[in-house]
């Protein structure tokens, strides 16, 4: 009996061991680990106490855990397998605590050790650390056959492009819109993922037939028809947006300044002599000291001048977007194959960011096209096995990047640096390619030489740009006081980088899926990177870091400072479904191929949502009619002949222009106007305008007047009248300024001259324009009218130098 018992016990041991082995295997399975990661990531949300401050702590802890995992991952790969999870966990927790500590100190706080081990911080740090560790373990990120680069890139992009760091650190309204978008992504994106999984699980054959039919159908279209058909659709879509939403008019100071400079170029000049009355033509980003021209490099205005010569300046950027599509396809086809290339073309065609930005006069669009040319030729150069092909592609690359430098030098330097490093690592294997680099440099030097010549003729020095003329050294990259007196710090740079990616989450697709999260998903499952993957990631990183170091926040219909890297972002998004499908099987594989197309279709089908392409169209169409003012139409309908039109802007805008006319720097003018009492500023301007020749010490005198003003004193009747004058109706000078005609002598003239309304100071123009019919554009006929009106000029409505009406 004892023997039987012993035999029974011995027989039971393997069964128990097998059970334990199965349990261990289950706990190590990617699905279980991934589920646990989601659970741990959601746990900090259970801590509701602490309000907004605790929410910021949780956000920073999440970002820190992701960033801390990057060095921990590099270390874990070198350790034995049992130590890897502990290393990842320790690195993630330490990263969370360090992130909160560093940010708190940068914001002026002084966290103590007791704060670091308190529940509101320690619990999120532990939970997010565990979540990141479980996720990386589920993905096998520390395995020997995995590269660290794609996972590290995914962690970094997640930390600042998915986790809303900008909302946690910034002091603006970024958090409001992102909270709404997060809810939209969780509900909309979550629903799409569940639908894709359900369809893939319940109807696998139907899903396979659908994806196969769509894929093969797209590939059956002849390449030329597919590419140029997409280009034509992009041209028509962008042109329609330009006409319907924006009335072919400029909508910010950058567009206005470059259109004006384009008119100057069209007259065969690089600049104009300064107008005798510059205060009446004051415009941001326009230089009117020594010579009259814009702050922008000559290339952007040159592109617009070509359009002005054909009377279709508004069509230049839509056309350049259309020409970008064949280049993106050519690069992607050589780098990744026809499937990814066609997916990238469709994504670029459906991207609201690409379409709305190209429906403008901004110089980012020419650079996008030139970068796409360089990328397409880089792929050709890389495959070239004969001297002629290598030299031809190198010459085109150099010409494209050199021309880009004449438009946006910083963007061109970023792209040229990244591409140059890749080329230098490749020329070792080919003497033909090595010699072609000389041709590339020479070709690039030609447009750069024209840029330097234009600088010399305008600013007085080849390496001095218009930006430096307006803002001096405060315009440069780095951490310093910006032209408006705000310190650009590493923390502010981090906020900018995060905000650009968060804006790209929305703008790139305007769909239930955040764009950066799609890229992250693809990177997490990428086992090895090709040279082209490294190139795209380097372009994204270089563009993001460089513009984070720039003091000005670039937002215009999306994160415009990332627009030059749009091909890289689009290709990374287009690659993601294929990467996830290749790394999975069965239901997950089918769902991976469904989710992104469903999201794009859902975005364009969401007619009632503001966060959609159609919602954006509706917003622009419903904007104030002021945004679609057409000076040519106003001139035609009013039958103006030999006229002078005073455009009445707000009192604040008038004050800014008058400060510029007094030779106050743009930054100082805006800083003083934003921080002082309007009546104090009015008095300071009047005092200086009485002695216009006393330029020396002017800024100090104005600041002394502003400091001496008593804000509790009763404002003068004249000041109150000035401030109330805005209620009579105001307009914007922006669309009118570039509509002026330049005479052969370099002076403003033509049938109609548009100037700023500066009140009684307008009378100084009697000698110069006294033979013209005078009008004022600004007052409303009736209160509540949506548009200003054009009325004959009434001298009795002007205010004299003391501010009283006469």
Residue ranges and their predicted role:
Residues 65-79, 128-142, 197, 323-326, ...:
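Hydrophobic, aromatic-rich transmembrane alpha-helices
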Residues 314-336, 373, 377:
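Transmembrane-helix motifs of polytopic, lipid-linked glycan transferases
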Residues 325-352, 368-369, 386-392, 396, ...:
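Transmembrane-helix signature of polytopic, membrane-embedded enzymes
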Residues 387-391, 426-441, 519-540, 553, ...:
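Membrane-interface helix-loop-helix junctions at transmembrane boundaries of multi-pass membrane enzymes
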